[in-house]
């Protein structure tokens, strides 16, 4: 398992934990190929640096593996064996090659980050798009867009995620976005994630509570 989380009283003010509670309390039921889950549509989470730290310290997040994974993504590495060599086995089901997945799009990040650091224009929105409708893929990115904006000398990072497993995947996605923000030579103001579909699988309900 990549990451673990649960809702506790000391975390109730953190917006990430509020989303967990909301899915548990108000989520509707849907059935998919991975099983039954509770879900909500079109939720938004905005996290300050302090709230990010709260999440990272309160979870058993595989930070080293996630750092290695992001580095491989940004280098455009598509060979699953390279991820396995870094101790990352959650891509094994994709076969030997990641087809039109995260590396295809994240390899565009280094030049974009360099451009942002060079220009630092508050009047410009810097955007990375991921995925393409109808493109063959063995794991299409759940992350669809990352936008970098500069407001009064601080970085505002905004992302759109088409689908998010709130209990298992979302903390890791948040950590990836945080690592990306660290490469921008500006203080971070906030990270906002717009969640098209955010869900918790029924077999994780008890653990999440």
Predicted regions and their residues:
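Terminal, non-catalytic protein-protein interaction segments that mediate quaternary/complex assembly
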Residues: 2-209
């Amino acid at each position: 398992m990549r990451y673990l989380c649960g809702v506790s009283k000391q975390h109730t003010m953190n917006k990430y934990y509020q989303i967990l509670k909301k899915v548990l309390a108000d989520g509707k039921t849907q059935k998919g190929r991975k099983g039954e889950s509770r879900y909500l549509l079109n939720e938004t989470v905005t996290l300050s640096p302090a709230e990010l730290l709260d999440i990272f310290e309160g979870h058993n997040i595989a930070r080293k593996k996630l750092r290695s994974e992001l580095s491989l993504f940004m280098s455009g590495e598509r060979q699953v064996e390279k991820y396995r060599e870094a101790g990352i086995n959650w891509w094994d089901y994709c076969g030997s090659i990641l087809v039109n997945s995260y590396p295809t799009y994240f390899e565009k990040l280094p030049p974009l980050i360099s451009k942002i650091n060079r220009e630092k224009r508050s009047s410009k929105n810097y955007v990375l798009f991921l995925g393409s409708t109808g493109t063959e893929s063995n794991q299409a990115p759940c992350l669809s867009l990352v936008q970098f904006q500069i407001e009064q000398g601080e970085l505002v990072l905004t992302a759109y995620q088409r689908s998010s497993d709130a209990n298992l995947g979302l903390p890791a996605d948040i950590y990836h976005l945080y690592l990306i923000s660290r490469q921008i030579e500006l203080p971070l103001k906030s990270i906002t994630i717009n969640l098209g579909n955010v869900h918790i699988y029924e077999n994780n309900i008890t653990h999440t509570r």
